[in-house]
Curated annotation (Swiss-Prot):
NCBIfam families: eIF-2B_rel, PRK05720.1, salvage_mtnA
Molecular function (Gene Ontology), one example: S-methyl-5-thioribose-1-phosphate isomerase activity
HAMAP family: Salvage_MtnA
Protein name per UniProt: Methylthioribose-1-phosphate isomerase
Residues the record marks as site: Transition state stabilizer: C148
Signal sequence range: none
Swiss-Prot/TrEMBL keywords: Amino-acid biosynthesis, Isomerase, Methionine biosynthesis
Binding site for substrate: R49, G50, A51, R86, Q187, N238, K239
PANTHER family xref list: METHYLTHIORIBOSE-1-PHOSPHATE ISOMERASE
Enzyme class: isomerase
Active-site residues annotated for this sequence: D228 (proton donor)
Amino acid sequence: MQTLQTTSLRVADNQLFILDQQALPQEKRWLDASTVEALVGHIHALRVRGAPLIGLSASLLLALLAENGHSRDQLAVALDTLRASRPTAVNLMNNLDRMKQALWQEDFVPALVTEALRLIEEDKQLCDAIARAGSQLVKPGSRLLTHCNTGGLATAGVGTALGVIAHAFAAGNVNNVWVDETRPLLQGGRLTAWELGELGVPYQLITDSMAASLMAKGQVDAVWVGADRIAANGDVANKIGTYSLAVLAKFHGIPFYVAAPQTTLDPHCPNGEAIPIEQRDAREVTGVAGSFGAVQWAPENAQVYNPAFDVTPAALISGWVLDTGVVLPEAVEQGVFKSSAV
C-alpha cells in the first residue's frame, strides 16, 4: 500500500502506525499497530479513539494484512475480532461491512486496499462537508462549548464538531471555545485543547461541572458535540457527560448541535435504549495515569460505575449536522433517520 499520513494514522513500509492519544499532549509518540492483537489493544486502551478513526484504522489493517499474505479465512476471523473491539461505535461496523464485501470478491487483496483507501478519502470529504454545513449555524462573536475530542485526532480529516468550530473560526465567527476536560480520561483537556492550540483557536479549559455556571451567566452561545451512534429516532450515543450538557443547554435555551458523518447513522437501531454502552475499567475513575506516571486518589476498594458513553434523547437536540446538511427535529420526527439515505 502507498505511504499514507493523517493526523493520527500512518502507513509506511506496509505497516500501520497509530498516534498514541494517551501520551498527548506531553509526548507525540507513534505506535506499531500492524497486528489484530496490537490494534485491538490500542482501541481498548484508547490509544486510538474516535468513532470514525477506529473504523478507518481497522479497515487499513485488514488491507495491509491482505497485502502481507493473510488468507481470506484469516482475514474473516480478523474482521470479526476487530468488529467486537468497540461495540458502541457504529462507524466501525459500517466500515467493516464494506470491507467484508471487498473480502469476498475474487481478487480480494486489491479490492480490500482500494476500499480502505476509499474510506479514508471519503472521511476527509465528509468532514469538510460537515464543517461547511455546521459553520453556517455559528453566529459572529460566538462563544462555543464542546465536549470530548472531535477533531483531526478522531478522524482522517478536519473533524466533526471541532471541524465546524475551526471552520467558523476561520470565517471570523468564534470568539472563544469552552473546552470541558471530559472526565474520566480528559479527552477535552488533553486532546481538544491541544488541537485548538495548534489551530490558533482561542479556548479556555474548564472542568465538566463548570458548564452550568457558564450557561447561567450567559457565557455560552451554543454547544457542539460529536456522536458515536445516532439511532433511527435521533437519539445520540456519545462520550459520557454529553447528556448532562444537553439537559443544561435545554434549560438555559442554548442550541445543542450534534455533528457526525452519515456513517454514524444506524437506521436499524430504533432508539437510544438499543445502543450497547461499553463499561470501562474502574481504575480510570479511581485515579489517573499518563506519561507523568500514575496516581490513585480513591480508596483501594472503591466500587465504580464507569460507562464510556451516555445517550442524549432526540428531544434535547437542536440539529444534527451531517455531511449532507443540517437535519432539524421536525425531519427526525418524520422518520428521516429510519432510512440510510439522508
